């Protein structure tokens, strides 16, 4: 079906999806501008919807403000704290949802006049939960998700005599396979040892446990999950299996292009980035697998929000419905930008069965769909971003300074417990 037809049907369907619809917006007679702040590649997805939007709202211009990922979230942090230069629609990555919700500057979309709670069953459960605060306010509507996956260079594994099962059977096996790969090809197992930590701490979290802090306010960073993550990261560093390369750096993309990084633990969306701009010349060399040791975890995801001080909330909500509640729009974004859909309706589409040329013809979308269905819904906590920084700093001390793991995690716990105590007062 042509893209234009998809978008026309998409808008028509999504405006009927809730009871809010056009009645809330009313007739738009005067010229208005709807501003949307986003980062790549959500900005391109939003821009692709403008032509169809204009057919319904010819007097509403859509201005998409695009910034690099970090710059976008820095700008939105400032805008929310000062209540100035706010867009009508703000796209937020999962890791920032709790931080932005903390200040109370985002609309609760779960209640009237938005009522997204009525559509809860249509979303991947863990994604909907990620946009919900501990108090039950739905401050962000999921658009795309990041089921965790292991991407690996099939050519490098073959050269080293390593099989996929060697990487995935266990985390210890993953590291051992890395030793063989490094010896045979010179390639690092991972870009940075922290990549292992990041996935392990997000894997197989129990309901109600939380990432860093549970529902009762108990700090979890000295639990077995974190000890295991730190031990594995340290083992990777001791075996010289990481290049100490930070994600999104020039060295990172060059490592993918030159074949000096054999695997990457990430969200499924990375396969699209590798294909589209990070390392398109490596088409056919990559494969995808589930995470080692039967782990399932979420890594990233994009959400739509409305600031409380936004000027055009009704129109903003119409746009958000169009982008999140329409199977056609979600599928279009999946096809064009590899934005894995948060809407369950789309998961039944035949597109999931199509081979991915970049991954050597593998039908990896089925793999990722299975992972998405097995990921536990994890409550967000407003101290998650702070906890992430504290834990990351302690890991650096372990990797770079030889700090004892239990001491590092105990120090991280003490710092976080003080923050939790202050928050409670």
Q: Where are the regions that the model predicts?
A:
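Extracytoplasmic "Venus flytrap"/periplasmic binding protein-like
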Residues: 52-123, 159-161, 166, 255, ...
